[in-house]
From Swiss-Prot:
Protein name: Maturase K
GO BP terms in the entry: mRNA processing; RNA splicing; tRNA processing
Keywords, sorted A to Z: Chloroplast, mRNA processing, Plastid, RNA-binding, tRNA processing
Pfam families named among the record's database cross-references: Intron_maturas2
Main location: plastid
Family: Belongs to the intron maturase 2 family. MatK subfamily.
GO CC, alphabetical: chloroplast
Length: 565
């Protein structure tokens, strides 16, 4: 093996070429000669995988005939050459591989092929060692009924009064390549592989849009995104594991908290971790609440019932909630104030030392639910809703024989507001109205038929109404209905080149107002409620839609408008 390896090195290092090493990219060639790197790239036999053989045996990898030993060695040769280009090269004409070269189809951009192969190996090693539990299989079978965008908001409204404080923060989209290497250092022990990956990341191969489109595999930026945010989510889950579980419960059973939080890590991301395509194509946006009580087994519940008398109600309900959409995150706890300051410093040190951020204490905000120091006007944007914690005064008048007793009870109320200004900006960008909210015709839909135009407007209107069915300011939905209704009428008038009166005579005044009722699930899942339409009863009931799973694009567009505001 050593003799063959030395001959292979001499064959490519001592090749008779008149070129000189000029670019920094040519230094990448020497990293390919490591023994552990070949089994990652060349997927020939199980024996050649080395220490990664157990990983590749578990996954049924479809062999791509365009990615072979010979093609990658040709890529290495092109790195060493001076005239590096994307066109096909025939440099094996005087070698014994000339006959095999005719059967192979060399890729036009070999550097990008190698770059994609490295990220494939990263995802295999990160994801393939994890097994599904019975709880996770049962969870994904009922995925359509249980997963919803509005489910975290509904549970937050139901349980937020038990939370004494919380944290809210936001982190940037951009990160340094060394941060990714620092994260991958936990899984990889191959130093040459990490150095080669560092070279690729510092060359910014993946940044330009033109290079990403020509890569044969899926988008590489989503892989870097997922690796980065998986590290952040695992940190917050580990904080809650060490911070929320009471000491008396841990004394009863040592594995009590570990068994609970292992299920949380499997249940976190709403993307099956063993599916290889989802990690490339989709970004991981968790919309679920991590609750230490609802995920316990039957045995753990028996232990909890046995110590109910010894633990108070607040210690027993050590519920924490962690939310994250895109870059915004929330954590709600039940602890005292001195411990909150330590937790805030812990989070800041993680962002500074682990992720290389330059943060101050003001970057992580307090979201105190029961505190007189909280500002009533403070609002937080989350899941395309505006969260506020205003004070509500209840007036109580007690009538006695002699005089009246008047009392005021002040309590905190959580409110979910509809960001009407951001929705108007989004509709104006799509040419449904101007920036002030005055509707106008959609000129791009003039070539469609009348039924297609009406159906698309009603579909857009119903999606917005279903998404904001849980907001407290339902009057803002009337403004959205006004914009979409008159925009539909103006597009039909522009198509037929008539006035609005003719359109109302032809189609009627209830153009986009169709009577419909749909069954949805609210907080009490044992009962079915019907969502009453705005135009049927002139009032919309405030309910949570637990079947709303496909409006991620609306959330991300509104978040971009909120950041640019």
């Amino acid at each position: 093996m050593k003799d063959s390896r030395e001959k292979l090195i001499k064959r490519f290092l001592c090749a008779k070429t008149n070129t000189k090493i000029v670019n920094q990219e040519n230094k990448l060639y020497y990293f390919f000669l490591h023994e552990d790197l070949y089994p990652i790239i060349f997927q020939n036999t199980d024996s050649s995988f080395g220490k990664f053989s157990s990983v590749f045996r578990k996954t049924n990898i479809k062999k791509n005939h365009r990615e072979s030993f010979l093609t990658i060695k040709s890529c290495i040769f092109l790195f060493r050459s001076n005239n590096f280009s994307g066109r096909k090269r025939s440099f094996f004409s005087n070698t014994r591989f000339h006959d095999q070269k005719k059967k192979e189809n060399f890729l036009p951009l070999p550097k990008k092929v190698i770059f994609s192969l490295f990220f494939e190996s990263i995802t295999f090693i990160l994801l393939c060692n994890q097994k599904k539990s019975d709880f996770e299989k049962q969870f994904f079978q009922t995925k359509d009924l249980s997963i919803s965008i509005q489910k975290p908001l509904a549970s937050l409204e139901r349980q937020w009064q038990y939370d004494s404080f919380g944290f809210q923060g936001c982190f940037s989209y951009f990160f340094h390549p060394e941060v990714v290497l620092r994260i991958l250092r936990k899984k990889f022990q191959d130093i040459s592989f990490l150095h080669l990956l560092r070279k690729f990341l510092h060359l910014n191969v993946y940044l330009s849009n033109n290079t990403v489109k020509e890569v044969p595999t899926n988008n590489i930026r989503t892989i870097l995104w997922n690796i980065y945010f998986l590290e952040i989510d695992s940190f917050f889950v580990s904080i809650c594991k060490n911070y929320c579980i009471s000491d008396e419960i841990n004394n009863v059973s040592s594995n009590y908290s570990l068994s609970c939080f292992e299920k949380i890590q499997e249940w976190t991301y709403f993307v099956e971790k063993q599916e290889y395509k989802d990690f490339f194509e989709k970004k991981l946006y968790p919309y679920e609440i991590f609750d230490t009580i609802t995920i316990r087994n039957s045995e753990e519940r028996r232990l909890e019932q046995s110590i109910k008398r010894q633990i108070s109600f607040l210690d027993q309900s050590k519920i924490y909630k962690y939310f994250r959409t895109n870059t915004n995150w929330f954590i709600f706890f039940q602890k005292q104030k001195p411990e909150n300051i330590l937790l805030k410093r812990w989070i800041i040190l993680f962002f500074i030392r682990r992720l290389g951020y330059i943060l101050q204490e003001n970057t992580i905000n307090w979201t105190l639910t029961f505190s007189e120091y909280q500002n009533e006007l403070s609002a937080y944007f989350f899941l395309a809703y505006i969260l506020q914690f205003p004070k509500k005064k209840n007036f109580v008048k007690i009538n006695t024989k002699l005089f009246f007793l008047v009392h005021y009870f002040v309590r905190r109320v959580i409110s979910f507001l509809n960001p009407l200004y951001l929705i108007i900006l989004l509709l104006s960008k799509q040419n449904f109205c101007n920036s002030f909210g005055y509707p106008k015709s959609k000129s791009g839909w003039v070539t469609w038929t009348d039924t297609d135009i009406i159906q698309n407007f009603t579909r857009l209107q119903n999606n917005l109404f279903f998404f904001y069915s849980g907001c407290t300011n339902t009057k803002a939905l009337a403004r959205i209905h006004y914009i979409l209704h008159f925009s539909c009428v103006k597009t039909l008038a522009c198509k037929h080149k008539t006035n609005l009166r003719y359109i109302y005579k032809k189609f009627g005044t209830n153009l986009t107002r169709k009577d419909f009722t749909t069954k949805i699930f609210v907080t009490n899942q044992s009962k079915n409620f019907r969502l009453r339409s705005l135009w049927k009863n002139q009032k919309m009931t405030r309910v949570w839609n637990f079947r709303l799973t496909q409006l991620n694009s609306l959330i991300f567009h509104l978040e971009t408008f909120y950041r640019l505001r």
